[in-house]
Amino acid sequence: MNFRAVGAIYKFEMARTWRTLLQSIVSPVVSTSLYFVVFGAAIGSRITSVEGVSYGTFIVPGLVMLSVLTQSIANASFGIYFPKFVGTIYELLSAPISYFEIVLGYVGAAATKSIVLGLIILATAGLFVPLHIHHPWWMLTFLVLTAVTFSLFGFIIGIWADGFEKLQMIPMLVVTPLTFLGGSFYSVNMLPSGWRTITLLNPVVYLISGFRWSFYEIADVSVGISVAITLSFLVACMIVVWWIFKTGYRLKN
């Protein structure tokens, strides 16, 4: 393992966060705070409770997951796309560093930034609603799994994209709708049986459900299923990344 090379990629990507602090940290925190104000205070005051929890408190895990998902994809996709765009990726591919180490550096940095952002948003949520985490270790487990999984997914998008439009297309047209329809603002159990069955095909449901369970011990699906689905998606992303480097897809042209 070439730790110096991995560390160089990791430090470069982390340094980019400080250069774009408003976009990377401040903007997501402010946007999520507006959700708390609108949905938690304005609308939440008119909703008694959801699954025995006040509405403002209920939406906290979903909003944290919303930010972690979107930022994981954005950080990882732009991180690998920019070297492709300027042509420096050829220097990276010809350097004495394995493909695994390249992925580890980029994905590790993207996941770290998303985890830190998630914790900041969680602390911000405590200013608006009372929070109590019943299972902190499970909370961290789901947070890390989600950040790593969707950073890998973002890495795949960054390699696949051949323009800035495509770089934004998957997050805007696929990931954001899946997140909003994944139980961020409501319990899946509130839906009619037909819609509930369709909703359970959404992988984001299992992430949010497991993450919410770590807070309030309430979930739309069992924790075991949530972990299994998340790990399955993680393995699928790892297989796709392996295939990309094995075939050179969108890397050598």
Can you describe what each PLM-predicted range is?
Residues 1-137, 141-253:
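Hydrophobic transmembrane alpha-helices and immediately adjacent juxtamembrane helices
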